[in-house]
Amino acid sequence: MSTSQNLSQTPVKETLLTPRFYTTDFDEMSKLDISSNIDEFEALLQEFRADYNRQHFIRDQEFEQSWNNLDSGTKALFVEFLERSCTAEFSGFLLYKELSRKLDKSNPVIAECFLLMSRDEARHAGFLNKAMSDFNLSLDLGFLTKSRKYTFFAPKFIFYATYLSEKIGYWRYITIYRHLEKHPEHRIYPIFKFFENWCQDENRHGDFFAALLKSQPQLLNNLEARLWCRFFLLSVFATMYLNDFQRSNFYKSIGLDARQYDMQVIRKTNESASRIFPVALNVDQPKFFQYLDQCAVENKKLIEIDQKYNNWFIKKLIKMPIYIKLCSCLIKLYLLPAIPSAHVVSTIR
């Protein structure tokens, strides 16, 4: 009889690129005035109540088999994908659940939206964790709740970052799904069949945060807002690009080129964001992906140094010029002229 290894009680080194757990200023959130956009929130609430994916996340017979046919390298990459995805979904669940509890009295419409989004995130995390059990692994989500460090983000930063996180999640899932529909020989595990409906949850969550941003015009209609939008667009895109550069072999195992995949996802997310953000990044400027490639190369050097050296001081010394190059590339990316998107009509699809 096989035993299940508990991954969440194994210490994990946190970096800027690892999935994080967030908290925010709940008092400030409770004072949000959403009256200018209440009709959209009411419509979104009806969408969440409908729970279109209630019967979607049910494992079928295709899961009931041995996965020993996967080579050890592919299996390790896939399990890491499941673990990171589960951690990210569970992080969303915790944040949304706490927001629903804190806002229940002051803003019941928003509170119920957060509650129903937390339902979706918990469902996703549970489904991913169950998939991990097929490989005799699991995440102790209760232990994870207590043991992980929480990063504080002001509400407006939560809005920007989570809007983009949900929208980029949509484009990641639907891009993989469409690719594997055309090339089923690369579908190494049945969870990918669920991505079409799954990504619609991400899309609806993104629409909710778009509605929050529109209800707070000061977050979209001035110079400060434009600068923050550029910052979060670049942060989310660069984080994904650097992460996926490290894991190109995973994408290769499902028949995708990681760089081409990321370029497609970035372009689509940038286009989606232009419907709500006042600016979009000029991702068609050749230097944009050239600088991202340079960032990915420098980031890989940092990882290799961690693997090669044990002495903390030596590692810091060797890393310093690499950090400077990496920061220089990121600054160059940020300073590339953005594209105004105020003329694009904001719509919720």
Swiss-Prot record:
SUPFAM superfamilies: Ferritin-like. Its EC number is 1.14.13.81. The keyword rRNA-binding does not apply. GO terms for molecular function: iron ion binding; magnesium-protoporphyrin IX monomethyl ester (oxidative) cyclase activity. InterPro entries: AcsF, Ferritin-like_SF, Rr_diiron-bd_dom. The keyword Chloroplast applies. It is an enzyme of class 1 (oxidoreductase). GO terms for cellular component: chloroplast. It is found in: Plastid, Chloroplast. It catalyses: Mg-protoporphyrin IX 13-monomethyl ester + 3 NADPH + 3 O2 + 2 H(+) = 3,8-divinyl protochlorophyllide a + 3 NADP(+) + 5 H2O. It holds the Pfam family Rubrerythrin. Keywords: Chlorophyll biosynthesis, Chloroplast, Iron, Metal-binding, NADP, Oxidoreductase, Photosynthesis, Plastid. Its cofactor is Fe cation. One of its GO terms (biological process) is photosynthesis. Pathway: Porphyrin-containing compound metabolism; chlorophyll biosynthesis (light-independent). HAMAP family: AcsF (MF_01840). Catalyzes the formation of the isocyclic ring in chlorophyll biosynthesis. Mediates the cyclase reaction, which results in the formation of divinylprotochlorophyllide (Pchlide) characteristic of all chlorophylls from magnesium-protoporphyrin IX 13-monomethyl ester (MgPMME). Belongs to the AcsF family. This is Magnesium-protoporphyrin IX monomethyl ester [oxidative] cyclase. The gene is acsF.
